[in-house]
Amino acid sequence: MTSQALRPDGARVRIGVVGCGVMGRNHARVLSEIAAADLVGIADPDLAVAEPIATQLGTQAVGDIEALIAMGSEALVIAAPTHLHHALATTAIERGVHVLIEKPIASNPEEGRDLVQKAARAGVTLMVGHVERFNQAVQTVKEAIRNEDILSIAITRVGPFPPRMSNVGVVIDLAVHDIDLIRWLTESDIVEVQPQLSNAVAEREDIALLQFRTASGVLAHINTNWLTPFKARHIHVATRDKYVIGDLITRQVTECSGYRPDGSYSMRHLPVGHTEPLRLELNSFLKALTSDATPGVTGDEGVISLDIAMRCLAGSSANAPAVADFAAAKARKVR
């Protein structure tokens, strides 16, 4: 089900942010800079945290989502802790308020599917914040491999242990980004999952080596951990005719092609835009509200990526195929 487009007259969308953690602050900052958005307020139970942020951005701070909705919010960004996503999004959806939910969509796939169904029944837009899709280095890689016979994808996403306390490990915090990217780049279902997990220094897994096979035959690998002293984000894609390397931090993309019998090849650096990914993500959400376009990441897609991540966490039992219908999710366009 699609929602009725807002603001055909070009007026700004009244939008609020729930949660004043790292991502909530970033969402609020970017929304305050977007002409199409009217940041009506930010909500957090800790007003001592929320009020200085609100003052800096020229908006209001309130203590809960109910107050934010009462201020006339037409849409909300939910950037609260994951275990609160389902309850907060349900409150918004039942009031007819459109929602962008930070990844993962919910604590588990069942809650995620429930939100998708509720949004469909209510006729509101539901988008999931898989921000790496909007990294222009990733978008350049996708364009470079368009119509290519993809053979393999290898993604590295590593860094130091996060300073903030978290109730999840690297699979949900980091690898779920790359599960989404593998599905998006290949436009194919992930049908096999082979995870190797370890908790070297943390209570939850802080090392994950994840292998996948897609329905189209692509072999994919994710290497992620919290043990590397520096951040690194790289993607390597091998196709029948080229090899593409993307650095998601520096946003440099290199394409190797034209392999010759003597082992030589041609190499070129592809042009990459440098717009902040979060700005592109929020613009996609606002466009979905004002033009009835499909949001950049649908609720269905968010649920599928979470389901595959949960299969990885299941350890050895995750060797059972993890089947997800990418084509059906796109066709339904449930938001």
Regions found by a protein language model. Give the residues of each.
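N-terminal Rossmann-like dinucleotide-binding module
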Residues: 1-57, 71
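Active-site loop of classical SDR/Rossmann-like NAD(P)-dependent oxidoreductases
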Residues: 26, 45, 270-283, 297
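Mid-domain beta-loop-alpha active-site segment that forms a flexible
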Residues: 129-136, 161-190, 301-302
